[in-house]
Amino acid sequence: MNASESLNAANECHDDDPVRGAALLRGIDAAALKADDWPLYAFLLNHVLIEKLGLPAEANERQHRLLAVAGETPAPVLLRHAAVSALLAGDSVAELAHAAEFGAATSVSTAQAVELVQLAAAALRVPGLGATAAGRLALDALAPLAAAHWQQTSALDTAAAAQCNNIAGSLAERPLADLADATLREAVERTADWSQVFWQRAGTWVNHERACYLRALVAGALGEAEAARAHARTGLALLDSHDSAQEQSVDRAFLELEQAYACERLGRAEEAAAAHARADALAADFNDAGLTAWYRQRVERNRLLKG
């Protein structure tokens, strides 16, 4: 395989087999990649080597090599990934240098860039921590978002939305016992809220609809059925308004599923059955093994949450 093929192979297998994904990444010479491949390569270095395997020093070394290949003006996304790996590797000098460059490249202060880097680093660390520690880390990373400079549109909004989305999704999928932890519960709700705030500023209607799905999923995980139903219905209303071509039928299936689950918990049996039937009909047309497996996982997860 050439470098791009190895990268694609790593991207396909890393969740199911992170060791193989890491081996593929290690075999890639960054100089042999096309510039268009660099963002995915940088993302996978941190996601696989740090989040999956706990190897921040190696990720940091490889991020530095990538920046050397990228030249004098690396894309902001490369600087962000490099700053995150430096932070988690304990390389404070490189962290601050990359964060300063990242801030300059995105027209924000170094302080705000550092806050985004810390949020992204938290997203990598949260999955490996216990419930209370994960919740506390997430809340600490969210705290700077209350500052005035985060209340206006900036070039960091999309990245902040994505990082909050990642943290909320990870926390919502924790073992059921973890969902009883007060710190984690506060963290998952607040990260989902912040994700929606940023997507409303920076995203398209599809991002807005998916933020509603995340809010529904989180509310369901927390046992807040009324809120879950309301968020799911808001997302479905956005689809009704914008998706006449039915290009987002996968999104609709998962929103209907969350609506069905919420209605079951609320005792709305007929409404639940109708929503579940619509979800199942849409899922039957996925023609994608991964999506079908994900749908079945959500069905089982909702069954467990319902108790």
Q: Can you annotate each of these PLM segments?
A:
Residues 37-38, 74-78, 111-113, 152-163, ...:
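Structural signature of alpha-solenoid helical repeat junctions
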Residues 26-30, 64-71, 100-108, 139-152, ...:
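Amphipathic alpha-helical segments of tetratricopeptide repeats
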Residues 4-7, 36-47, 74-81, 110-129, ...:
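Amphipathic alpha-helical repeat scaffolds of TPR domains
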Residues 17, 54-55, 91-92, 127-134, ...:
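Residues in the short coil linking paired helices within alpha-helical repeat scaffolds
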Residues 13, 49-50, 86-87, 123, ...:
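Residue at a conserved register position within TPR or TPR-like alpha-solenoid repeats
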Residues 9, 259-307:
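C-terminal non-catalytic interaction modules
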Residues 52-53, 89-90, 174, 182, ...:
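Structural motif corresponding to the intra-repeat A-B loop/turn of tetratricopeptide repeats
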